[in-house]
């Protein structure tokens, strides 16, 4: 193995471990949602808001960290964000009311955004478009370990300890990640390539992205794809645990099926993206999600049972990494000179739409799985429509 291959492996592995923080802070927490509702004596919608505010903070944080990463470099931004993430996790563990937890989760998400933005920008500094998509697939492959194990670990933490310890574990993980960043990650943006941090320049860069209708459509399509998955993350614990009577400690095993599909589709993407291109892989992922959403609606109408929903959700979620990595590859290829800003806006759309959809879904009454199913179907349809709009022939 060459030095370059060793270096690539090390970068992918470290960034994959760093990227675990975001899914860990959601997926380990999912089995605790019904328990937290009962402990604080609040309805399911109030507890779901702790997820929505986390995603909202994550979305807004992208707008902050992207321009900062283009101006001050990648390493100081991600290191600072990860340390704040650890502090916010401690604050969540010490929350005494649901309102305190909702507020602290917002700051938790705000800090978590640093890693997401910097990982995308750092990888784009190193790799061209098709190689970027391939290497990002491997980052996401490493990251799948977290959501595979997180709900299982979270469920057993609930059995043996309490939901507070979930956040103590997250704080410890963030401190370890900070040490890896400090000692093992090198700066990839030299000073001569950095953009001055001026509000006018930042606004101008965002305006350039908004004027690019095709790229904007890809951002929206990717955003609704993620929002479909977030519909499950927000409502799934209640649909599985309360409506279908899955034990909290067993929820993680059902969730693991999603990760199996995610693993398979990530491998599929890494094998074929060089052959058929990032854009075609992106479109394929969206169409698979649309078909799976239609399957969930039809199977619910026909009363095909709980497992038809479980499989449909798993296949839908399995395509998220393929959609996200290829969408980011296409978007950053258009704006390589401001990869941090472009990555931040794409992330804001992805997680902002997820936060809005999750907040609206929290208003629903969960006597059945229908609110979640309709939300997923709406998001999948929206993704396809934006993708079709972006694929229209250019006017001469």
UniProtKB/Swiss-Prot annotation:
The keyword Repeat does not apply. The chain crosses the membrane at residues 9-26, 49-65, 77-98, 106-122, 138-159, 166-185, 215-239, 251-268, 286-302, 309-332, 345-366, 373-390. PANTHER family: MAJOR FACILITATOR SUPERFAMILY, POLYAMINE TRANSPORTER 2-RELATED. The lineage of its organism: Bacteria, Pseudomonadati, Pseudomonadota, Gammaproteobacteria, Enterobacterales. GO terms for molecular function: cysteine transmembrane transporter activity; dipeptide transmembrane transporter activity; sodium:proton antiporter activity; xenobiotic transmembrane transporter activity. Involved in sulfonamide (sulfathiazole) and bicyclomycin resistance. Probable membrane translocase. A transporter able to export peptides. When overexpressed, allows cells deleted for multiple peptidases (pepA, pepB, pepD and pepN) to grow in the presence of dipeptides Ala-Gln or Gly-Tyr which otherwise inhibit growth. Cells overexpressing this protein have decreased intracellular levels of Ala-Gln dipeptide, and in a system that produces the Ala-Gln dipeptide overproduction of this protein increases export of the dipeptide. Residues 1-8, 66-76, 123-137, 186-214, 269-285, 333-344, 391-396 are cytoplasmic. One of its GO terms (biological process) is response to antibiotic. This is Bicyclomycin resistance protein. SUPFAM superfamilies: MFS general substrate transporter. Pfam families: MFS_1. It is a multi-pass membrane protein. One of its GO terms (cellular component) is plasma membrane. It is found in: Cell inner membrane. Belongs to the major facilitator superfamily. Bcr/CmlA family. Keywords: Antibiotic resistance, Cell inner membrane, Cell membrane, Membrane, Peptide transport, Protein transport, Transmembrane, Transmembrane helix, Transport.
């Amino acid at each position: 193995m060459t030095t370059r291959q060793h270096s690539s492996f090390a970068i992918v592995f470290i960034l994959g471990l760093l990227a675990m923080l975001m899914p860990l802070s959601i997926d380990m927490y999912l089995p605790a949602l019904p328990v937290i509702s009962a402990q604080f004596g609040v309805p399911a919608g109030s507890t779901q808001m702790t997820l929505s505010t986390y995603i909202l903070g994550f979305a807004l944080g992208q707008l902050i960290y992207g321009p900062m990463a283009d101006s001050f470099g990648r390493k100081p931004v991600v290191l600072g964000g990860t340390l704040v993430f650890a502090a916010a996790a401690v604050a969540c563990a010490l929350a005494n009311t649901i309102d305190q937890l909702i507020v602290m989760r917002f700051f938790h998400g705000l800090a978590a955004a640093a890693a997401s933005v910097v990982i995308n920008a750092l990888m784009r500094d190193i790799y061209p478009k098709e190689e970027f998509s391939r290497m990002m697939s491997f980052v996401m492959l490493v990251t799948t370990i977290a959501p595979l194990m997180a709900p299982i670990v979270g469920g057993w933490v609930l059995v043996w300890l309490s939901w507070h310890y979930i956040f103590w574990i997250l704080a410890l993980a963030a401190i370890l990640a900070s040490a890896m960043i400090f000692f093992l990650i090198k700066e990839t943006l030299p000073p001569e390539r950095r953009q001055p941090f001026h509000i006018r320049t930042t606004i101008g860069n965002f305006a350039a992205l908004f004027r690019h209708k095709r790229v904007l459509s890809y951002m929206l399509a990717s955003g609704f794809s993620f929002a479909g998955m977030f519909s499950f993350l927000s409502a799934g614990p209640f649909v599985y645990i309360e409506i279908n009577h899955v034990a909290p400690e067993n929820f993680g095993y059902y969730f693991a099926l999603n990760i199996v599909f995610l693993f398979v589709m990530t491998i599929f993407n890494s094998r074929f993206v060089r052959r058929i291109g990032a854009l075609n892989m992106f479109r394929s992922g969206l169409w698979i999600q649309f078909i799976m959403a239609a399957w969930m609606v039809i199977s619910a109408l026909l009363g095909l049972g709980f497992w038809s929903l479980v499989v449909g959700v798993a296949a839908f979620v399995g395509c998220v990494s393929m959609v996200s990595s290829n969408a980011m590859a296409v978007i950053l290829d258009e704006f390589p000179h401001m990869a941090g800003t472009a990555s931040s806006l794409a992330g804001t759309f992805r997680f902002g739409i997820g936060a809005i959809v999750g907040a609206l879904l929290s208003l629903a009454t969960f006597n059945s799985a229908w609110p979640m199913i309709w939300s997923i179907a709406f998001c999948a349809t929206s993704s396809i429509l934006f993708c079709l709009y972006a694929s229209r022939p250019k006017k001469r």
